[in-house]
Amino acid sequence: VRDAHLTTTEVGILVAAYPAGVLLAAIPSMALVDRRGVRMTTVVGIGVLIASTLGFGWGTSPLLLDASRFVQGVGGAVAWAGALAWLTSTTPSARRGSVIGGAVGAALVGMVIGPSIGALASQVGRGPVFSALAIVLVVLLLAGPSSAPAPTPRRGSVQALVKLLRSRRGAMGNGLLLVIGTVGGTMWSLVPLLVAHRMGGAGVIAAILAVSYLLAALWNVFLGRFSDRFGRLLPTLVGLAIAAALLPVIPVLSPLYVLFMVSVAAQSVISSLWTPAAALVSDGAEGSAAGQAVGVATMNAAWAAGGASGPVLAAWLADAAGFPLPFALAGGLCAASAVVVLLAYRRSGEPKAAASTAPAVERR
């Protein structure tokens, strides 16, 4: 932010650029899995990530930084679609929550390094740091497994998409991911600015991000297993209720250490909802690699739609009316979502993962 001299609104645009790229790549990634298979999709996504990481490291203008983050979102969406469809298509439905939780947890553990990289880049420069990160991605690409489910000869992505859109579980999961993207993007665009206003530096921001990611990784692993056994809605309801209570108070917290603790708690709770929400979508999708790729594509699109719009709107509201308003709206969105989940829970009972083994007609 300081290196590129970005305003509050420009920070919101930079945060939104990544999910905007994810949104753009959602449907193409689904088609790529359908035609070329999960391994080729993963390889293509990582390749795009490598190129865009170098661009972000050496870019100097706000426009180039936004473009690099946008392309990173494209690469991330493609790689995630291939990798997660690879995992879920080879896993029984009763264990998909655990598998998704492990995958999301592993990704978040990797993201713990991100704030440290950001703090290091602020000291030695973005170019060398992000070039080293690109080399790490190359190593991961070369070390990937060589075998994967072959692409299906029949192009079934359209039919799988139609079935998923008619699934109540899929609709609920994607709606929740939209909320997660909106609220998470709001926090990531505004919390660093709140820290700066309280005279906190890059180290404090990096610590908030790192601890949040680490806690969220642990929560995702736990909630994946919990949701396989007790259903997807109960942990989602509890998490939304906690977030609704914490979010409105964040901008009025004055001591920096209190802001640190509450921000970490709120962000880790929001991020932990990824697993039960994604498991709902996976339950509603077909079990084949193409069907699961469709599920991942809609997950990406739903999360990205919120993640792209939330930061920009939140930053604009913060500029126009101050920080309390966007945080209050984010808390209200979580509260409204909790009511919807509660009504679904009371209407049909907890939909356990075992129910997802029923025929697709019964799940609609």
Regions found by a protein language model. Give the residues of each.
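Short amphipathic helix-loop junctions that connect adjacent transmembrane helices
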Residues: 1-8, 189-203
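Residue-level signature of mid-helix packing/kink "hotspots" within the transmembrane helices
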Residues: 19-27, 111-112, 213-221, 307-308
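Conserved MFS/SLC helix-loop-helix module at the cytosolic interface between two early adjacent transmembrane helices
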Residues: 24-60, 227-233
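Cytoplasmic helix-loop-helix junction between adjacent transmembrane helices
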Residues: 68-107
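Intracellular juxtamembrane helix-capping segments at the cytosolic ends
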Residues: 78-91, 272-286
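Helix-loop-helix hairpin linking two adjacent transmembrane segments in secondary transporters
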Residues: 102-145, 324
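C-terminal membrane-cytosol helix-exit motif in multi-pass small-molecule transporters
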Residues: 134-153, 340-345
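Juxtamembrane intracellular "pre-TM" segments in multi-pass secondary transporters
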Residues: 147-174, 359-364
